Amino acid sequence: MTNKELFYFTGKCLSLDDHPEFGQEIVRLCKSELIDWQRFVELCNGHLILPLVCLKFRSYDLLRHLPEELATHLKDIFELNYHRNEQILQQLDAITRTLNKHGVEPLFLKGAANLLDGLYSNIGERILSDIDFLVQEKDYLLSAELLENEGYAMVEPFSGDIATEKHYPRLYHPDYISIVEIHRLPVKKDYQHWFNTGLIEAEKKPVGSLSGCYVPSDNHKIVHNFIHSQLANEGYLYGTVSFRDLYDLYLLSKRTDLSRTVEHIKSKQKVVAYFAFARLTLGLDDTFYPHRNFNFRVLTKKHSLNHQSRFFYTAFRSAIFISKRIFGGYVFQFLKSLYSKEMRRSIVRRLRNPRWYKDHFNFYKRFFSN
């Protein structure tokens, strides 16, 4: 299998519930030895979906057809993630109790919200990176103080203005398993005019299994999924998509109509492309989402080229990244500093802070190491 073929094979594995007959194709491929299972594991591991793959294969009695070592590995990963998510649920409870004592009710986001809201068939299905939650702006710094009083601390020192950041610097606790991000804003300021705390609060849902906290409506979860995947993480720009995001979208589409959600999203051409790409990747029919557009063809082409050529992936990604940093970052900030005293102060403050240089270097290092 080529990289592209392996990617789409993996997508159909995730949506076996919609086409269980694909299980027979998996059995045939197992017998033919056409799949490089090492590459399959590397792909799934990179997208953080090994526990999900294990659950799908187990549900359709496919594990016994895999190489024994692979089947054992998948089972072990699933069990580890199951127990990890049990601990995360306990951490979510502890966070909620701590904040509730002072009148703060967190609104959990992303994977934590989906886990609490029963989106997954099994708590071991989804790997959670961080615990993200949103609070009212008046409770932002208070929430951080309350958690820090309980033993949480910053993962690393922060050199900026915490009060104006989208979220508080990442926090960890030696007795808990997950990193925590306290959000003042749900998304970057670029998207605040059409997706903000007020909108989310208006449709938030209480969590049945944990009183004192909330999650976004399914409609807003989909909007946030798109913004996170294709705008904030620039998936559309680079031609990259996460299987975790696609799978969450797939499950949410069973609760709400994607065509209606599009009406609430300003970047309509890109969201149509994203939904259409999800349909293609997961091997679904038009009941998932019936539309396609030019942007879909662009996204698909960039994604295909990324798989076909490592050189294209590296060169294309690096060219965009460097251009954005030079013209969208350095040049823009310099020009703005000519008329903005606040920007001049910000630049001087950063240039005088040794920590800023280290953070800057690490930022570039993380990007080019991927």
What are these regions (language model features)?
Residues 1-129, 135-370:
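Conserved NTP-donor binding/palm subdomain of two-metal-ion nucleotidyltransferases/polymerases, i.e.
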